[in-house]
């Protein structure tokens, strides 16, 4: 029998053999008649590759080699892509710029990536992208590290809009419109389907997003700026996350007000100054995990009467 000195033993098992065949799927999004998703690719250094699977289960690679679809925002990262119509927008990890690709129906292929932003490399980061089709622009959370000069300086978070109808793409930050700023952290902007309203979350130091967050709603003017900005459930002492418009005036989100992250709703009436929410699905279990990464969604509205939601019970995730 072969023996060896402890620690110096030459094991046939190494880290490469453990991870070389491991692929994970994340960030699913229904698009056209199929599904967009990210998959880790071990053969390319475990980067995130954007894929598309159509109704015939024909799966195509969207992002080309050399692109890693991932955001560095808040260090933990955020949802790095979105899609609408024929267009896909995503964050590239290597330079933290936003790129776009289009689906070419005539050839059933995807166009080459085109840079949308030119923002000083990874000193400016983006995440939680949303497309505002009514105004032909992209809305995103921007985290700007250019102002950090000392150890006590911090990055600046803003909610920005970037016009897509310009021939001058890519554009720098000077061409972007600031919609909201002043909070230490921002995440998860969601636009109502009619393009009239916007919801997002914000929080301040020393809170983490699982401690205490603000759920902010606002009307969007035809020109694009926000007005009638209000908070749902006030400042409160709860973590509110994953806002999603079911209709133009009804907002669903998750809140741990009861001690568990459960599904709640709010009927928006901007004539009121104190918007309150109510329970949609209450259970003594969490319907999401701590929001380390922004832009996630743990529930899906099936129709006007049904919602599918994930629930963790006895350390196991289940679909309710």
Stretches found by the model and what they are:
Residues 39-49, 69-75, 90-99, 119-125, ...:
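A flexible loop/linker signature enriched in serine peptidases of the S9 family
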Residues 78-86, 141, 300-301:
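Repeat-blade elements of multi-bladed beta-propeller folds
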Residues 36-66:
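Beta-propeller domains
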Residues 30-32, 83-85, 131-134, 193-194, ...:
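Residue-level detector of Asp-centered blade-edge/turn motifs that repeat once per structural unit
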Residues 1-24, 54-76, 101-125, 160-187, ...:
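Multi-bladed beta-propeller domains
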Residues 86-103, 109-116, 125-138:
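Hydrophobic or amphipathic alpha-helical targeting/insertion segments
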């Amino acid at each position: 029998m072969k023996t060896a000195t402890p620690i110096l033993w030459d094991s046939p098992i190494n880290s490469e053999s453990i991870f070389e065949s491991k692929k994970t799927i994340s960030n699913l999004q229904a698009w056209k008649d199929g599904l967009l998703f990210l998959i880790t690719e071990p053969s390319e250094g475990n980067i995130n590759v954007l894929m598309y699977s159509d109704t015939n289960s024909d799966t195509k690679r969207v992002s080309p080699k050399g692109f890693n679809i991932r955001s560095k925002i808040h260090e933990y990262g955020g949802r790095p892509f979105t899609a609408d119509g024929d267009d896909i927008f995503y964050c590239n990890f290597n330079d933290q710029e936003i790129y776009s690709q289009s689906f070419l129906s005539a050839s059933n292929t995807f166009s080459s990536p085109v840079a949308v932003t030119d923002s000083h490399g990874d000193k400016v980061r983006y995440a939680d992208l949303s497309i505002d089709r009514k105004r032909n622009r992209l809305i995103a959370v921007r985290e700007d590290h250019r102002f950090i000069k000392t150890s006590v300086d911090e990055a600046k978070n803003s909610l920005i809009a970037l016009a897509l109808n310009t021939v001058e793409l890519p554009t720098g930050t000077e061409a972007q419109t600031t919609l909201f700023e002043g909070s230490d952290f921002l995440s998860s902007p969601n636009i109502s389907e009619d393009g009239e309203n916007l919801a997002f979350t914000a929080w301040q130091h020393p809170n983490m997003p699982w401690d205490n967050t603000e759920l902010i709603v606002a009307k969007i003017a035809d020109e694009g700026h926000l007005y009638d900005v209000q908070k749902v459930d006030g400042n409160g002492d709860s973590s509110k996350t994953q806002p999603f418009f079911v209709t133009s005036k009804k907002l669903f989100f998750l809140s741990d007000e009861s001690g568990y992250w459960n599904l709640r709703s709010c009927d928006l009436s901007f004539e009121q100054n104190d918007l309150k929410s109510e329970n949609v699905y209450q259970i003594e279990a969490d319907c999401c995990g701590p929001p380390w990464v922004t832009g996630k969604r743990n529930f899906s509205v099936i129709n006007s009467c049904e919602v599918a939601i994930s629930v963790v019970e006895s350390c196991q995730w289940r679909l309710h």
